[in-house]
Amino acid sequence: MQTSDTRALPLLCARSVYKQYSGVNVLKGIDFTLHQGEVHALLGGNGAGKSTLMKIIAGITPADSGTLEIGGNNYARLTPVHAHQLGIYLVPQEPLLFPSLSIKENILFGLAKKQLSMQKMKNLLAALGCQFDLHSLAGSLDVADRQMVEILRGLMRDSRILILDEPTASLTPAETERLFSRLQELLATGVGIVFISHKLPEIRQIADRISVMRDGTIALSGKTSELSTDDIIQAITPAVREKSLSASQKLWLELPGNRPQHAVGTPVLTLENLTGEGFRNVSLTLNAGEILGLAGLVGAGRTELAETLYGLRTLRGGRIMLNGKEINKLSTGERLLRGLVYLPEDRQSSGLNLDASLAWNVCALTHNLRGFWAKTAKDNATLERYRRALNIKFNQPEQAARTLSGSNQQKILIAKCLEASPQALIVDEPTRGVDVSARNDIYQLLRSIAAQNVAVLFISSDMEEIELMADRVYVMHQGEITHSALTGRDINVETIMRVAFGDSQRQEASC
């Protein structure tokens, strides 16, 4: 955050930037400026144009018209290589690392020989408080650490303009604070940061200025200290209000299939002393009709536990009971057929086939149940049902999943999981990287699913989200659940954080 009002020449000045796709205006004369040593936050609803603007600045997508002034020089368009040479680096929401290469190889990949300085890399690692084993494979990192590796790649290229797309989406409050303290050190060197996020408290903490995009325009811009939260939310979307799903949406959302319906409170998924990679001796019960929160810091073992429940990782000990029957030896496909469905944390690498059509993605978990031949008309009808239920925005069923915004991709992934008719639904960071309006849609959706007596295991690093959504909460700390479930008034951010950090003094709540 800037410590002085004295400003040199802007690092970046975008003027009258226009862009359209298939005749649809995505950007309508955008003006955007970034100064040295400042954080300029960029907010906006689903499809507002944020990603398109940043891709133009990073040289990934050309603008139809307009100019970019960088370092006093004007450019009509950039390429990614030219943007890097000018000191621009985009850290994407979904880190683009090579999983089979080491952390060191990923950080240094593509650098010119003159930039291949091991000492510089070590200095950056120390400054950012990173304690990576540089020889470990990047594929072994969690999302938070992959994000840090992407930032390091930019810093190794002497970037002066960093574009951070939802950098804290999968970070805990403690990790977010650590990232922010490192960003402050970067700002002191004159680096400018474009900070894309939907988390208003974090934006108020880190940003000097805020710009809100809506429908391809800048709807609001100003100093953070001069803008109220109501102003910002109203600028994002006038219709953002807490509301239930409409009767029509609920009708379209009725779960398919003929799964037996459990009575509310019936145990659906029971874990007995589970031990696996990243966790040990975990026991809990997930009941029909409830949303059970699973909180904890990144690295606490929550994702590893979820992947083990679904059969993606090897179980080393304990029992998994689904509807009273042990499923330890069942494959992932067999668990799916019995009603256990998993929505993964990383929608792009694990959840969706980005090059496949939207209709194919929504029906991906049920294709084997429909016979050998694809049933395009039926798949399209299924997609249409979820479009109406979840307000998914797309042009045609045949378009590739990668063409959608992050929020709409997440809704497609949720639709895919629901189409499998879950009895127990595990959702890992379901609102990661989605806008304010879509986040509320997902909340209401999960409540509606639980109301149909589905048992929902809700994993999130956002403690406020856990407090808002969960009927009961378990907290993992260093791979273990050391306390009984939080209930009632104990479900609050302060208590959850204390347990997540290993505070053993909390009074135990009744299970």
UniProtKB/Swiss-Prot annotation:
<comment type="similarity">
    <text>Belongs to the ABC transporter superfamily. AI-2 autoinducer porter (TC 3.A.1.2.8) family.</text>
</comment>
<dbReference type="InterPro" id="IPR027417">
    <property type="entry name" value="P-loop_NTPase"/>
</dbReference>
<keyword id="KW-1003">Cell membrane</keyword>
<dbReference type="GO" id="GO:0005886">
    <property type="term" value="C:plasma membrane"/>
</dbReference>
<keyword id="KW-0997">Cell inner membrane</keyword>
<dbReference type="InterPro" id="IPR003593">
    <property type="entry name" value="AAA+_ATPase"/>
</dbReference>
<keyword id="KW-0677">Repeat</keyword>
<comment type="function">
    <text>Part of the ABC transporter complex LsrABCD involved in autoinducer 2 (AI-2) import. Responsible for energy coupling to the transport system.</text>
</comment>
<keyword id="KW-0067">ATP-binding</keyword>
<dbReference type="GO" id="GO:0016887">
    <property type="term" value="F:ATP hydrolysis activity"/>
</dbReference>
<keyword id="KW-0813">Transport</keyword>
<dbReference type="Pfam" id="PF00005">
    <property type="entry name" value="ABC_tran"/>
</dbReference>
<comment type="subunit">
    <text>The complex is composed of two ATP-binding proteins (LsrA), two transmembrane proteins (LsrC and LsrD) and a solute-binding protein (LsrB).</text>
</comment>
<keyword id="KW-1278">Translocase</keyword>
<dbReference type="InterPro" id="IPR050107">
    <property type="entry name" value="ABC_carbohydrate_import_ATPase"/>
</dbReference>
<feature type="domain" description="ABC transporter 1">
    <location>
        <begin position="12"/>
        <end position="240"/>
    </location>
</feature>
<dbReference type="InterPro" id="IPR003439">
    <property type="entry name" value="ABC_transporter-like_ATP-bd"/>
</dbReference>
<dbReference type="GO" id="GO:0005524">
    <property type="term" value="F:ATP binding"/>
</dbReference>
<feature type="binding site">
    <location>
        <begin position="44"/>
        <end position="51"/>
    </location>
    <ligand>
        <name>ATP</name>
    </ligand>
</feature>
<keyword id="KW-0472">Membrane</keyword>
<keyword id="KW-0547">Nucleotide-binding</keyword>
<protein>
    <recommendedName>
        <fullName>Autoinducer 2 import ATP-binding protein LsrA</fullName>
        <ecNumber>7.6.2.13</ecNumber>
    </recommendedName>
</protein>
<feature type="domain" description="ABC transporter 2">
    <location>
        <begin position="264"/>
        <end position="503"/>
    </location>
</feature>
